[in-house]
Amino acid sequence: MTMITDSLAVVLQRRDWENPGVTQLNRLAAHPPFASWRNSEEARTDRPSQQLRSLNGEWRFAWFPAPEAVPESWLECDLPEADTVVVPSNWQMHGYDAPIYTNVTYPITVNPPFVPTENPTSCYSLTFNVDESWLQEGQTRIIFDGVNSAFHLWCNGRWVGYGQDSRLPSEFDLSAFLRAGKNRLAVMVLRWSDGSYLEDQDMWRMSGIFRDVSLLHKPTTQISDFHVATRFNDDFSRAVLEAEVQMCGELRDYLRVTVSLWQGETQVASGTAPFGGEIIDERGGYADRVTLRLNVENPKLWSAEIPNLYRAVVELHTADGTLIEAEACDVGFREVRIENGLLLLNGKPLLIRGVNRHEHHPLHGQVMDEQTMVQDILLMKQNNFNAVRCSHYPNHPLWYTLCDRYGLYVVDEANIETHGMVPMNRLTDDPRWLPAMSERVTRMVQRDRNHPSVIIWSLGNESGHGANHDALYRWIKSVDPSRPVQYEGGGADTTATDIICPMYARVDEDQPFPAVPKWSIKKWLSLPGETRPLILCEYAHAMGNSLGGFAKYWQAFRQYPRLQGGFVWDWVDQSLIKYDENGNPWSAYGGDFGDTPNDRQFCMNGLVFADRTPHPALTEAKHQQQFFQFRLSGQTIEVTSEYLFRHSDNELLHWMVALDGKPLASGEVPLDVAPQGKQLIELPELPQPESAGQLWLTVRVVQPNATAWSEAGHISAWQQWRLAENLSVTLPAASHAIPHLTTSEMDFCIELGNKRWQFNRQSGFLSQMWIGDKKQLLTPLRDQFTRAPLDNDIGVSEATRIDPNAWVERWKAAGHYQAEAALLQCTADTLADAVLITTAHAWQHQGKTLFISRKTYRIDGSGQMAITVDVEVASDTPHPARIGLNCQLAQVAERVNWLGLGPQENYPDRLTAACFDRWDLPLSDMYTPYVFPSENGLRCGTRELNYGPHQWRGDFQFNISRYSQQQLMETSHRHLLHAEEGTWLNIDGFHMGIGGDDSWSPSVSAEFQLSAGRYHYQLVWCQK
C-alpha cells in the first residue's frame, strides 16, 4: 500500500489528476465481480451475499468551483452548507454545474496532461456502521463501480487512495481504516483530470459517483481472481471447462479449490485440486494459482439465439472440506474464432445485427438501473438485434450478466477516445500515455472475460493508430487468445485489429480521404492480401428522420459472406429532461444548459427516443434484420431460416390475400425450419377478383407463445408481394348535373350543387373551396419543392460554420426556400360535362426560373376534381427535396384513413418495412415527434386518402399534421411547436430520399434523388 500523508493540502499540491503516470494509488487489482459467499448453495443460485453491502442512497454533498476551494475541515466532518444527493447520480442532474454535450471538441482547453484550474469538485461523505465480525477477521473492501473523472478517498479522516478511469471499478482495502461504531467516508471527485483526455467520447460530459458503491467483506485467505474458458473438440460434442483460480493471503498446504459446474439443479462436473500451477519456466510455476479442467459431454452451447447457461461455483476450502469462501459466475459454452475470412461462433459464420449503445437516461443522465437495461435488451431482441457494441467504454457490470442471460453478442470497448487531438494519435502514440491506456484495456479484460456474451474486445474508439494500440493488441492476444480484437482507428484495417471494422463506409461509394481512405465495403474485401472479415463498427447514422438506404447494406451483407454485418449508430437519443417555468418537462440537447462548446442536437442519433419510445426507423431495421427470408414462386412460399442454431419451435406463418386492404383469403401454417434450413409452403388457389384494385399477399411470422424477451403474438418477420392490379376505366356516376363556371376580374368560380371551387386569376392557385357555407381551405393549394430540413439535410452546417455542400445550404443558395411563383397562364374552359382550369407558373428567385409547373384541374358533374401536374426542373438548380402540393385545410378531424404503405412513417429509401393496406390512425399519430423538428410523417405508395369530408385518390405520398413545414423549419425544439389552425396537408408526386449512411455529408443515394428534370403526376380530389 502506498503510504501518503492524510493532508488535503498535500494531495492538492501533488495534483495526481494531472499526471498520466498516476492512474491509481492503492487501488486493488482488477478481477471479475465478487460476492464472497460463505455458502456454496447461495453461490450456485446467485442469492444475495451477506458479505456484499450496498452503500447506495443519500450521501452528504458539497460542490466547489475548484479542488483548492475545498476546506481541510471537510475531511473530519460535514460542512454546514452540505446538501444531500442520491448516489449513484451525476451531480449535473441535480443542478450543480452544467452538463456539456460535445462530439469531437474537448470541453476543456487542450493542454495534456493539464486541466483548467477552474475544475468543478464535489465532496461526498457518508456515515455508516460495519458489522463487528467484519472488523475482527478478514478484509473489508469498498468498490466504486464508476466515478467520473477522478477521485481521492478518505476514511475516518485518513487518506485511502486515488482512482481514475470513470468506467471501470476502483476498489480499495478499508480494513486498516475502519473502527467499531460509526465510520465516515469522504470522497473528493474532480470533474476534469488527465484521464479526461482519454475520454473524449461523443456524449454528455457529466461527473460524479454515477455507478454503485458497495462494501465487500472477504476472508484473509481468499480467492483473488478466477477465469473460466471453454474448449471443444471438432464437432462440439465434448468440451472442457478450464478454470484458473488465484488466491492471496497465507498459502497453506491444506488449502484446496473445488470447481463445480451446474445446469440448474444438476451437477454436471466437479474437480478439486491444491494450489500450485503448471511449470512455467526454469524457475517453476505459480504457487498461488491452480488450473482445473472439467470434461463435459454434449454441452448445451451458448449463443444469442439459445443462451444456454451453466453455473460455475469456485470454492476455497480446507482439506477437510471447511468452506472459506465461494465465488461463482454464469458459464456459456461457446467458441469464437476467425477462420477463412469469417467470424465464427461455434463453427457457424455470424451475421452481426448490431447496434451501438450509450448508457443514457433522460432523467438520470448516465446512471443505469436494471429496469432500463432490461428494457433496452428486450427492445433489441424484439427488433431482431443480436449484438451490441458498448460504445465507447465498459458498461455497468450488470449489463454483461443480462446479455449473457437474454442472449446478445457484445463488443466490449475500452474507455479510450482522443478524437479531439490533432492528430488523433498524439497521445496513443506517446509512451508516456501507455500506462493509462494499458490500465483501461487490461482491467476491462480482467473484469469481463468470464462473460460468454463478450465475443470481441475493442481497444477503444477514434484515437488514431499509435504504437500503444499495437502493444495492447498483443497483450490481449497473449492473455485471451479466445477472442478477436477490433479497432477502427487509423483506417479500420491496421495491424491492431483482427476485423476490418470501418465506420460509415458506404456500400458502393469510395471515400478516398487522405491517409485513411474509406473504401466501399464491397471493394474493401477485394483489396490485395486482405483476408479478414468486415464488420462495420458504426453505420446507418440514425439521427432524427434517417436510416434511408439501410436495405442496401443488408442486400450486400447477404450477398457477400465476408461482409458480416455491423452496428447501427446508435440505440438511444441522448436528450435530457429540463423543466419550463411551469414545471412542464421538455427534451434538451447540446447548448440548452448554457454549455459551451456544444454540438447541438448531434447527441440524438437513436433508433429510440430517450424514453425508449421507438423511432419509425426501428421498424425498418427490424424488417431488414429479420431471421426469416421469403421467396414467392407461383403459389409456393419458400421460407429460409437465418438462425444458425435455433430450430423454429414457436412460429406460425400467417398469410393473407387482400384487395385494396380487404381480405379475400387467409391461412396459417406452423413453421418447422431447421437452422439455416428451408420450408416450402403451398398455398391454395389464390382468388383472382374481377374488380379493380391492388391484390397483395402478406405473410407474417407470429410467435404464439411468450418468450423471455417477447409477449405472445409477437411478430418477428413479414413480407409482402403485389400479385396483380386489375385495371378498369373509372366512369363517373351518371349525372345530368354540369358544373357552372362564373368568371370575374379576380376569380374563376365553379359551382355544383352545394360545392364551390374558387381559382384566383391573379395567383393562378385554387384559393378556396366550399361545402355548403363552410370554407375548406385556410391557404391556397400551391406547389411545394422544399421540406423542413432533416438532420441529414443540414449536415454540419450551423450559423457559425456553413457547409456549402449540405443539401439545405444548396437549396438556400439556389433560392428554393425563397422562390416566388410568377403566373404564366390561368384559363378556364367549359367542356361538355366539366370545367377545365389550366395554369402555369414559373417559380423564380432573383430573376432565375427554378421550376415550371403546369397544372390542369378538371371538375366534372360528379364533383370530382382531377388534378394533373407537370413540372420541369432547371438543369442547373440542385435536385429538389420534393415535387408536390400543399395547403392548409380548415378541418381538424380526429382520424386519418389511407390506402397505401404504413402504418409507420416511411420514405422512398426507407419503406421496405411498410405494408400496403388500409390504415386508420389518429391525426396525432401521423406526426413523428423528433426532438429537433423536421420533415416527418410521410406515407408513400398511397392510392387513397380520407380526411374529414375529403378524399384524394391517385398514386402519391403525403403527410398531414397540425404543423406547417415553415414552423418545423423555424422551431428548435418540439415542445416549442404549437398546433396551428386547421390541418396542413402535403401531397407529393415525388419525394427525395432521406439518406442516413452518415449525417454530415450528403448521403441520399442517386436513385433516390429527384434528378430526372421532368415530372408528371395526377390525383383526384373529391368529397365523400
UniProtKB/Swiss-Prot annotation:
One of its GO terms (cellular component) is beta-galactosidase complex. Na(+) binds at residues 202, 602, 605. Mg(2+) 1 binds at residues 417, 419, 462. Substrate binds at residues 103, 202, 462, 538-541, 605, 1000. It catalyses: Hydrolysis of terminal non-reducing beta-D-galactose residues in beta-D-galactosides. Its cofactor is Mg(2+); Na(+). Binds 2 magnesium ions per monomer. GO terms for biological process: lactose catabolic process. InterPro entries: B-gal_small/dom_5 (IPR004199), Bact_Beta-galactosidase (IPR050347), Beta-gal/glucu_dom_sf (IPR036156), Gal_mutarotase_sf_dom (IPR011013), Galactose-bd-like_sf (IPR008979), GH-type_carb-bd (IPR014718), Glyco_hydro_2 (IPR006101), Glyco_hydro_2_AS (IPR023232). The active site is at residues 462, 538. The record marks 358, 392 as: Transition state stabilizer. GO terms for molecular function: beta-galactosidase activity; carbohydrate binding; magnesium ion binding. The keyword Methyltransferase does not apply. Transmembrane segments: none annotated. Homotetramer. This is Beta-galactosidase.
